[in-house]
A protein has these predicted regions:
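A short, N-terminal "cap"/entry segment at the start of jelly-roll beta-barrel domains
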Residues: 1-38, 53
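Conserved short histidine dyad/triad with adjacent acidic residue
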Residues: 27, 42-57
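A generic "binding-loop/recognition-motif" signal
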Residues: 48, 59-60, 78, 94-95, ...
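Short beta-strand segments in beta-sandwich/barrel cores
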Residues: 51-52, 69-74
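Ligand-binding loop in jelly-roll beta-barrel domains
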Residues: 72, 92-116
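Short acidic-glycine-tyrosine-enriched beta hairpin
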Residues: 78-92
Length: 116
């Protein structure tokens, strides 16, 4: 299955999970297209100072992969600075957040996968 960039759904969301700013999302595939293999697959852009607030994963897990820039990712209270190519996976029963602490945009891939 192919999905061209100009066919992808986009959204701007405000203060996600209590975070700051209005991150933008480009959904690579819909949940229906993914057939239950993933609940969400999106490239998210955080402008300087923007964040996705701390949130739990209770019936799924979420992976972040930094594609451009850098971000501070906090999992279960432990903060790490991630750079291009670095990744984090928040499993069921854990919490995480992501914040662009830099002066340049940060782009990351976010994939939410259901528990099996």
């Amino acid at each position: 299955m192919f999905q061209m960039k100009d066919e992808m759904q986009t959204a701007v969301k405000h203060n996600i999970r209590g975070g700051e700013g209005s991150p933008s999302f480009r959904y690579l595939f819909s949940a229906e297209q993914l057939g239950g293999r993933a609940e969400m697959m999106a490239v998210t852009t955080l402008q300087p100072g923007e964040s996705v607030g701390v949130h739990p994963h209770e019936t799924n897990g979420e992976a972040y992969v930094i594609l451009e820039g850098a971000a501070t990712v906090t999992e279960d209270g432990q903060a790490r600075e991630l750079h291009i190519g670095d990744a984090e996976f928040c499993a069921d029963g854990h919490t995480h957040s992501i914040r662009n602490h830099t002066a340049a945009p940060t782009r990351f891939l976010a994939v939410i996968v259901p528990n099996k």
